[in-house]
Amino acid sequence: MASLRSATPRLRSYFRDKYIPQICEALLCGLLVTCPEDPLKYLEHMILAIIKRGLENLLWDTCIHPSLKSRVRRLSETYLDELFGLDDQLVTPELMIKACTFYTGHLVKTHFSGWKKVAIPRANQEEIMAEKMDKAIAHDNFRCQKYIFNRWFAYTVMSRERLITTLLRLRHLFYMQRQRIILAKWKERARHKSKTREDDLISKHELQLKKWKFKLGKPISLEGSLSDIAVENRRIAFDISVLPEQAILQIFLYLTFKDMMACSRVNRSWMAMIQRGSLWNSIDFSTVKNIADKCVVTTLQKWRLNVLRLNFRGCDFRTKTLKAVSHCKNLQELNVSDCQSFTDESMRHISEGCPGVLYLNLSNTTITNRTMRLLPRYFHNLQNLSLAYCRKFTDKGLQYLNLGNGCHKLIYLDLSGCTQVLVEKCPRISSVVLIGSPHISDSAFKALSSCDLKKIRFEGNKRISDACFKSIDRNYPGINHIYMVDCKGLTDSSLKSLSLLKQLTVLNLTNCIRIGDIGLKHFFDGPASIRLRELNLTNCSLLGDSSVIRLSERCPNLHYLNLRNCEHLTDLAIEYIASMLSLISVDLSGTLISNEGMTILSRHRKLREVSVSDCVNITDFGIRAYCKTSLLLEHLDVSYCSQLTDDIIKTIAIFCTRITSLNIAGCPKITDAGMEILSARCHYLHILDISGCIQLTDQIIQDLQIGCKQLRILKMQFCKSISPAAAQKMSSVVQHQEYNSDNPPHWFGYDSEGNPLDKIHSRVQLRTYSKLIVKEPFSIDEEDPDSKHQ
């Protein structure tokens, strides 16, 4: 061993590089521990195992069986350090002695210090113990204080959060309570204001009713003038002639021809006021009953240079009287519709003397092809021509319009009731009316494709189908009025085609029973709904609330809406209708609207025309709730609502004083007391329908004559308690009257005593009847050019 320690560096390096000490250590340790019977085979087997495992991972106990390995680590790394140790691995004897000395001294010092503390007690042990106890007590107090502080801090944080939450809740409750108080005060003030207004209206109503009853106590002349009957208060004298001339003209423009004649007989001042030429630009003879032919001739001769518009609708004059029209050289508009005495000879005289006519209405007259030949010869500037229900001219007569200079400026031609139409010679026609022409088919639209049509009106045609609208957006891009009534061949596909018309403003699909929610959805999704101002879906019974919801979203400019007999509409649809602030007219007749729906509809305070006819769920409460907020209401139709009583008449008289048209037909509970209140308050009433009001008597005739001076149309059918004599007196006051004293028919829903009949039987017949008398809402777009003369 000593010789190996003193070996050369080369040999020592060889031993270190080839792992000779580790190999020897592992083999020798294995032999010493294992003690095999055949050491050589054991060494051979271990050498092969060492070669297989490699020398880098060789440990001293590699050749020892795991069960024989030592469990306690030795102080020395190897057993052979002393034998084969290297300089950097071996511990020198000097270092070993020094280490043992240090270790022994450390043990002695440690054990001696411990023995010293135990064996030699200190003199101030009690003070030390007291000091330790003080430290322990202080530590324990600190620990307790820390624990308590942590608990207190957590409680304080939680209390603060709870306080903040409570304060926020209290503030929210305070704001809510304050809002409730403010809202309650506002409601109370609004209720008080409304109650004050109602009381004021009721007091005025009672005062006016007293004056009214005072009037009834005086003798009344039915033949008197149209001026008001004097009341107990003295009238203030006022001379109308001191007004500015423009104001006088505006006042007299509202008078009829009969009133003008009456004014001319008041005094010389009034006679002078009506001698202004501008008052005689338009003369309407259709409102006059039993006027002498001499008066007509005299008037036309006197104002022949001022007359621009003449209306003879329904007048029965002799031919020589109509010849006087030829003296009106500046005449521009002439209406002779329904004049059975108007012949081709009359037309010859007019055409020779009035070449400047622009608007000519010859509907329902006996003209023939001779008149059709005169039109292009003399009326070169004719723009609007109505030949509705003139059945004595032929297709050849219609072709005369292109003769000579022709009526090339014609833009409106009404051929309603004319079964054959040829318009290929009139390319400038923009409006076609084919009402009462059931033989027109889809091919007619192809013939009209060369015309720039703006308006189309069809009615009662079963041959028109969806095919006519297939290319309507390309053929008629500027069309704005479509009137397709009772065309049962139209389906949802037609609405899909119509949705592309950007200029459409009026759409009337009355009695198109195959139209449903799907078609309307396609229509409202298109650009056509943006400009739409009037929509009529009467008797389209397949429609539901979803269509109305979509309608309220896509039609911001809609003014007139007719949903009559759409039986699936409920109060939900009414809520969306009430949100359409552009509406001024709505027809909900025959729907399921109830009192709640009428209350919702009362939010819309701009409606002027409302129709809820045949709505069996409506009572006095619903009408009262609506009328109290509808001060602008002008037209109200509550016909066939048999539950209504005089209470609604009183409500209408108090709150709806501007009403001009009222329909209470089929309301058997209305009495003379209600009509007395109506006559005392509603002085602007023009149209009144009381058909089927079996409790009304002759007293209402006197009331209406006194209170409703402007009444023009009165319907009193099935009023058994009104005598023919009273009705005859009233006929001389109004322009149009319908009267009979028969018992109400079964489809009114009640008998002659007002007792209800079988609901199913009466309701079915009433619904059938309502389809026959569908009332078209007023619209400027649907008005004929010469309707203003009618």
UniProtKB/Swiss-Prot annotation:
Superkingdom, natural source: Eukaryota
Record flagged with keyword Lipid metabolism: no
UniProt xrefs under CDD domains: DD_FBXL13 (cd22977)
GO cellular component: centrosome; cytoplasm; motile cilium
Compartment annotation: Cytoplasm, Cytoskeleton, Flagellum axoneme; Cytoplasm, Cytoskeleton, Microtubule organizing center, Centrosome
Signal peptide positions (record): none
Domain F-box: 237-283
Residue stretches of each LRR repeat: 503-525, 531-552, 557-579, 582-602, 606-628, 632-657
Gene3D superfamilies per UniProt: Ribonuclease Inhibitor (3.80.10.10)
InterPro entries cross-referenced by the UniProt entry: F-box-like_dom_sf, F-box_dom, Leu-rich_rpt, Leu-rich_rpt_Cys-con_subtyp, LRR_dom_sf
Keywords: Cell projection, Cilium, Cytoplasm, Cytoskeleton, Flagellum, Leucine-rich repeat, Repeat, Ubl conjugation pathway
PROSITE patterns: FBOX
The family this protein is said to belong to: Belongs to the DRC6 family.
Annotated function: Substrate-recognition component of the SCF (SKP1-CUL1-F-box protein)-type E3 ubiquitin ligase complex. Component of the nexin-dynein regulatory complex (N-DRC), a key regulator of ciliary/flagellar motility which maintains the alignment and integrity of the distal axoneme and regulates microtubule sliding in motile axonemes. Specifically targets CEP192 isoform 3 for ubiquitin-mediated proteolysis and thereby acts as a regulator of microtubule nucleation activity.
Subunit structure, interactors included: Component of the nexin-dynein regulatory complex (N-DRC). Directly interacts with SKP1 and CUL1. Interacts with TCTE1/DRC5.
Name of protein: F-box and leucine-rich repeat protein 13
Gene label: Fbxl13
